[in-house]
Amino acid sequence: MPKAKFSLASREVKFKDQGRIEMARVFLSPPNMGGDELEYIKKVFESNYIAPLGEYVNRFEDAVKSYTGTRGALALNAGTAALHLALRCSGVKDGDVVLGSTFTFMASLNPIFYERCVPVLIDSDESWNLSPKLLKEAIKKSPKKPKVLVVTHLYGQAAKMDEICEICANEGIDVIEDAAEALGGFYKGKALGGIGKCGALSFNGNKIITTSGGGMLISNDEELVAKARFLSTQAREPLLHYEHKDYGYNYRLSNVLGAIGVGQMEVLPQRVKRKREIFKIYEDLFRGTDVEFMPEVEGGEGNRWLTTLLFKKKNAHLKVIDALNKADIESRPLWKPMHLQSIFAGALSVVDGTSEDMFERGICLPSGTDMSDETIERVVKIVKENI
């Protein structure tokens, strides 16, 4: 059997067999443990408190509150759960209109269906995020007065929150931030997710930090967070016996995963620093070529969760993705806009072709925080050879 050499720094596995060296697959954004997670998990097992809730869930929530500067945080089993509770706590009813970014992942908008609301989809502008201009148009065209806007901070980069929040404030529309990809990103000194009424974070396995699966609702509205906490534990009344006056959900995070989260929060600043370094390396290596990177809005400092770019020609990304895959390197197209998905057939979409154009020309490149600079150079070499 060949002997394997494991590099904890790069997760690159080299197998030496009769002079051959094979590199492990390079993933888009794999987990990267900080080192203390196992110790914290061990303490959870020693306490036998492995169920939802517990000391490490509390510590995880406190760490996120401290980092984001928000007054309330609720650890949950998914970012989608956080978005669902945010929408439920906003007071929407059957048939209410909820505005949302079209250039996003389906999980951003699934809660609209959970609450039997009516989606109205809004296109992006040059920032790749939701267009304030089209937001105004969508409000005018909406079949009824919108109650909520769910705005996505795409790929960890800030949307134009000053303009968006001002428009929504003037119209009496609550702003929920889908910051699932954006923990560690800021806009004019404020943490993404902590600017609107509330925000949702994700700790899925591919995010900048992970708890394997998980999410968090953050807000400066402590009453909203308290209501969400109540709903997340089956809406059980605080009595000796089980009493229920409303319906709730089983959305809480386990103490085991909370322990992972505590360890991950300890290394979040380093993870953000490395993500931004990776972007800068890509940017430098592609200098002089005909590609366009996702920009940063004025006042924004995103986490650069994934390095994304556009090629000049439509569908050029498909050849590149195929070439990278043959080299055992993962890459992906950009999100397919929601207004092109069959589930949204018939929904009002205020679009101008921006996200469709980006979808036809864009690619997500490997951006794992444990990638070596040499691996990034290898990725760029293959891309250049195939555009």
What residues fall within each predicted segment?
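N-terminal "arm"/small-domain region of PLP-dependent enzymes with the aminotransferase-like
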Residues: 2-51, 366
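PLP-dependent aminotransferase class I/II
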Residues: 5, 16, 58-62, 70-71, ...
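Phosphate-binding glycine-rich loop
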Residues: 53-97, 111-115, 121, 190
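Short beta-strand->loop structural element characteristic of the AMP-binding/adenylate-forming
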Residues: 100, 118-127, 332
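Conserved coil-to-alpha-helix start sites within the AMP-binding
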Residues: 104-109
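Helix C-cap/helix->beta junction micro-motif
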Residues: 115, 170-171, 327
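Active-site phosphate-binding strand-loop segment of PLP-dependent enzymes
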Residues: 127-211, 216-218, 223
